[in-house]
């Protein structure tokens, strides 16, 4: 082995060996298979730390399964469809300054190459090469024969087949539907197309039509039931409103809304015509009619009304909305004569419409007063609003004032009221984003009611029922995400599946439309199996007919009929079908949590729609995001840490280990320079340890006579083997690295500190295999230096051997380590130079007391009095009658509080503490730097300060002779 760890040299060496040996190219055989996939990357930038985390998790799982004896397929492709790459090409062609800066400075594209990437095709080719290179350089065990891009002509044939079959099942429909829309591109946008607001959802509001003469002042609300409690409207005096003629289904009305709302209305299925501007003052102080109750309500000024939200006019329900109550109260003593308002607003009566167990008649007023909220600007007002809303939604029922709706649950009334209000022309539906959305082209997006649009009919209850069934049979990692998946399935509505611009596959039954980017990335895992035959030239595009896909993916028809249609031999068709049946279904789909509400859901929907139940996915795993020094990363805006730059600077194995050890699976990780530097030092130490063990030439097997410290390290390793395997099964990579590296490293240090050396080679043999999924290049290098001919990537992963567990040895070493730490702490605190240390082992009666306490704890009968009574009934313990009550009063609270772990281990093997400490005297004297004497607390020969009485089982009392340091 080299003197120093040189990651880049080692990594290039082993990547070359892996490629040459083709050990990651998977073919069907007699072994149990494991098919793992992760979302292929979108090629509008270089791979970043977020990809690094998700992809490395996948690789670690793949490598672990491979070492456990599974036949593992871990493939990769590239996603390029949609509009982002087209938009990026336009920005580069136009030399957009921000784009040129971000892609040269942060993505690392050379300045002479970047300007040439001015077409989508050039961008795809460039990032495809760079992404594959980055994944090879970090050491992913991918079968690269199966790679493809989503604009490959053969892939388009696969997508056409999928959509023809979905259409035949009635799962693709045409109609009007609200979609996220870019007015500039004149296209629907999906998450990949969005610059800001990627997590925004389309929210359905009910517009309530308050009337003033021949005008309608509509108000958007998420809670149409509160219309029964409206006392006034809020109008912003600083906003310009417009009068518009609005026509829907032949019904013509004149509406007053903000200019921003007018723009949004033009994208709905209404016909909207601008008439004139309306000064805000002209609609403040007017008396309007509540269309639901026919009550008269007044409009009042409110600067908090935002013109871009809803219609720019807000209805006020002060009995149930804390902000409305506060805003109304704030106006009680304000002179509003400039708006023609002279009446006393205190006379406005609150209207109660919801009965809530936790509140009286006016929940908003009650919570404002109980929380001491003084104004609308008080931060507690937001908290109060959430509390009232939550309690009313989950436990509220409507009162008599709501007429026929009395007694209905608030949680179930929205759709009923919206339907009834629409039918009576007192309300309409209006769609709004949950937060602002900006397209990657820079244009603010709108909710557009698109006519003649194609949709995937995800709201279909029969389709959803199959997805629920699939989910119920699946393993979800972590399990707590199951509820989120269930909720997302429940809420999922029809989704636009086509666009008119961008890269992608044309809808086979309507060539004017292109299938959108999330719609063509749902069952591509099955294409990996076909891609291997395309790559070797056995399949051509003309062979990929509908009957080809029907036969090899669905098993429909027979090979003879498919052969006649495709021009392929029956034998080849049967071979491809055999490959599909071997590899499918997907055993694990692992992804970032941002894909839960979209891609991962669609992945399930399309699988259950097209495949038989035995081909449905088996498991889903979800991981968190990665930030950079506390900042959220962005491919288009920065900051960003690319996979290539991390590996180039720190090496593949250090990058892999660090990204997986910073946070547990669903937690968000934060990449920090200080952290990666620490990981580098840890890996250096591991390399140095391995080099030292190998060069020592000492090899011992388990038949050698073993000392206690040897039995201890054997036992500890088994614990780490068990816990690492368990953590990897649960995809808890941080926990796995803690056990397989950091905790084991600490124990190896203790083993060597205690003079252990017999089993260092055995330790290294297991340690290298434990770490191989995480740091594969380094482990291959060490494995080879140990004399192994076959790669560690294919070696047997360590398996737990219960026969090597030695509780006695572990307990003994824990006592020695704890005793040493206690002595060192006393010396540190007292600032003493020790001359002699006296250790006092616990009297036997204390051990008996603790054993009795453990038994009574298990029987749920542990109480101070009960334990004293039981101990005093023992004739051998009666003579300790004065000391027993004090000790019992000390230990029982520890048992009760759950802090009795150190006592409970006493129920295990018997330890002769005095003999153990006497055997360890030479070690303790070397560590402490002075002589050590061991006494029994039952009869200490020397105890000038009566320390022996403090001795407890496994925790000797300590007295130090010495002098203060000058």
Curated annotation (Swiss-Prot):
GO terms for molecular function: aminoacyl-tRNA deacylase activity; ATP binding; leucine-tRNA ligase activity. One of its GO terms (cellular component) is cytoplasm. It catalyses: tRNA(Leu) + L-leucine + ATP = L-leucyl-tRNA(Leu) + AMP + diphosphate. A motif ('KMSKS' region) lies at residues 632-636. InterPro entries: aa-tRNA-synth_I_CS (IPR001412), aa-tRNA-synth_Ia (IPR002300), Leu-tRNA-lgase_arc (IPR020791), Leu-tRNA-synth_Ia_arc/euk (IPR004493), M/V/L/I-tRNA-synth_anticd-bd (IPR013155), Rossmann-like_a/b/a_fold (IPR014729), tRNAsynth_Ia_anticodon-bd (IPR009080), Val/Leu/Ile-tRNA-synth_edit (IPR009008). The keyword ATP-binding applies. ATP binds at residue 635. A motif ('HIGH' region) lies at residues 41-51. GO terms for biological process: leucyl-tRNA aminoacylation. It is found in: Cytoplasm. Its main location: cytoplasm. NCBIfam families: leuS_arch (TIGR00395), PRK12300.1 (NF008957). This is Leucine--tRNA ligase.
């Amino acid at each position: 082995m080299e003197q120093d760890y040189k990651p880049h040299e080692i990594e290039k060496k082993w990547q070359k060996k892996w490629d040459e040996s083709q050990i990651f190219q998977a073919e069907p055989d007699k072994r149990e298979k494991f098919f793992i996939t992760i979302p292929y990357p979108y090629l509008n930038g270089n791979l970043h730390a977020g990809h690094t985390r998700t992809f490395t998790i996948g690789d670690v799982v793949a490598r672990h399964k491979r070492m456990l004896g599974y036949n593992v397929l871990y493939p990769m492709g590239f996603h390029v469809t949609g509009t982002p790459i087209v938009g990026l090409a336009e920005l580069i062609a136009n030399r957009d300054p921000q784009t040129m800066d971000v892609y040269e400075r942060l993505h690392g594209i050379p300045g002479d190459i970047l300007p040439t990437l001015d077409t989508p095709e050039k961008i795809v080719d460039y990032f495809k090469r760079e992404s594959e290179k980055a994944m090879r350089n970090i050491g992913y065990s991918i079968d690269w024969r199966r790679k493809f891009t989503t604009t490959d002509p053969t892939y388009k044939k696969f997508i056409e087949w999928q959509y023809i079959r979905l259409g035949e099942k009635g799962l693709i429909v045409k109609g009007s539907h609200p979609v996220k829309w870019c007015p500039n591109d004149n296209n629907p946008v999906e998450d990949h197309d969005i610059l800001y607001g990627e997590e925004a959802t389309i929210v359905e509001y009910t517009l309530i039509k308050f009337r003033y003469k021949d005008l309608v002042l509509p108000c958007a609300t998420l809670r149409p039931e509160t219309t029964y409690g409206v006392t006034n409207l809020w109008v912003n005096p600083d906003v310009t409103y417009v009068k518009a003629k609005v026509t829907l289904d032949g019904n013509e009305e004149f509406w007053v809304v903000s200019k921003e709302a007018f723009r949004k209305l033009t994208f709905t299925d209404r016909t909207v015509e601008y008439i004139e501007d309306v000064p805000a003052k002209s609609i403040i102080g007017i008396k309007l009619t509540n269309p639901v109750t026919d009550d008269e309500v007044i409009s009042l000024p409110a600067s908090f009304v935002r013109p871009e939200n809803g219609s720019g006019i807000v209805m006020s329900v002060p009995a149930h909305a804390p902000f409305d109550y506060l805003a109304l109260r704030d106006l009680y003593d304000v002179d509003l004569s400039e708006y023609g308002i002279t009446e006393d607003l205190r006379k406005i009566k609150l209207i109660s419409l919801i009965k809530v167990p936790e509140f009286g008649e006016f929940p908003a007023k009650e919570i404002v007063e109980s929380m001491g909220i003084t104004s609308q600007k008080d931060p507690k007002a937001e908290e109060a609003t959430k509390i009232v809303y939550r309690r009313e939604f989950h436990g509220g029922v409507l009162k008599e004032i709501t007429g026929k709706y009395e007694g209905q649950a608030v949680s179930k009334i929205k759709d009923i009221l919206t339907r009834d209000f629409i039918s009576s022309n007192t309300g309409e539906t209006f769609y709004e984003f949950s937060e602002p959305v900006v397209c990657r082209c820079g244009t603010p997006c709108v909710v557009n009611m698109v006519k003649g649009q194609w949709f995937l009919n995800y709201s279909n209850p029969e389709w959803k029922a199959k997805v629920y069934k699939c989910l119920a049979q699946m393993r979800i990692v972590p399990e707590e995400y199951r509820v989120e998946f269930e909720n997302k399935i429940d809420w999922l509505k029809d989704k636009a599946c086509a666009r008119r611009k961008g890269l992608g596959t044309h809808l086979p039954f309507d060539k004017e439309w292109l299938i959108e980017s999330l719609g063509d990335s749902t069952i591509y895992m099955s294409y990996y199996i076909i891609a291997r035959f395309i790559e070797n030239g056995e399949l051509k595009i003309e062979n990929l007919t509908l009957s080809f896909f029907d036969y090899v993916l669905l098993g429909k028809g027979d090979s003879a009929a498919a052969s006649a249609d495709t021009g392929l031999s029956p034998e080849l068709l049967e071979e491809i079908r055999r490959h599909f049946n071997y590899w499918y279904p997907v055993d694990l789909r692992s992804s970032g949590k941002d894909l839960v509400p979209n891609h991962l859901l669609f992945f399930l929907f399309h699988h259950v729609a097209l495949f038989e139940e035995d081909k449905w996915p088996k498991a889903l795993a979800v991981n968190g995001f990665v930030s950079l020094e506390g900042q959220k990363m962005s491919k288009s805006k920065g900051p960003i840490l690319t996979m290539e730059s991390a590996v180039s600077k720190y090496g593949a194995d250090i990058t892999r280990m660090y990204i997986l050890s910073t946070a547990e699976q669903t937690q968000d990780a934060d990449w920090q320079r200080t952290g990666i530097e620490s990981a580098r030092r840890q890996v250096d130490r591991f390399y140095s340890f391995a080099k030292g063990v190998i060069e020592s030439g000492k090899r011992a097997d388990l038949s050698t006579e073993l000392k206690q410290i040897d039995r201890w390290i054997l036992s500890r390793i088994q614990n780490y083997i068990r816990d690492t395997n368990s953590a990897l099964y649960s995809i808890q990579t941080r926990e796995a690295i803690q056990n397989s590296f950091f905790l084991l490293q600490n124990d190896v240090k203790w083993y060597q500190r205690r003079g252990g050396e017999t089993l260092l080679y055995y330790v290294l043999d297991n340690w290298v295999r434990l770490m191989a999924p995480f740091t594969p290049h380094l482990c291959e290098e060490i494995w080879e230096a140990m004399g192994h001919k076959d790669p560690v990537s294919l070696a047997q992963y360590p398996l737990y051997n219960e026969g090597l567990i030695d509780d006695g040895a572990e307990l003994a070493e824990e006592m020695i380590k704890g005793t040493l730490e206690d002595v060192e702490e006393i010396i540190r605190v007292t600032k003493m130079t020790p001359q002699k240390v006296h250790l006092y082992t616990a009297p036997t009666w204390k051990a008996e007391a603790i054993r009795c306490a453990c038994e009574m704890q298990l029987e749920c009968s542990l109480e101070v009095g009960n334990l004293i009574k039981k101990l005093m009934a023992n004739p051998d313990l009666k003579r300790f009658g004065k000391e027993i009550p004090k000790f019992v009063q000390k230990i029982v609270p520890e048992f009760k509080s759950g802090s009795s772990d150190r006592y409970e281990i006493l129920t295990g093997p018997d330890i002769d503490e005095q003999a153990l400490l006497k055997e360890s005297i030479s070690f303790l004297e070397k560590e402490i730097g002075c002589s050590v004497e061991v006494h029994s607390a039952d009869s200490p020969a020397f105890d000038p300060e009566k320390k022996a009485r403090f001795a407890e089982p496994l925790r000797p009392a300590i007295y130090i002779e010495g002098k203060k340091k000058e």
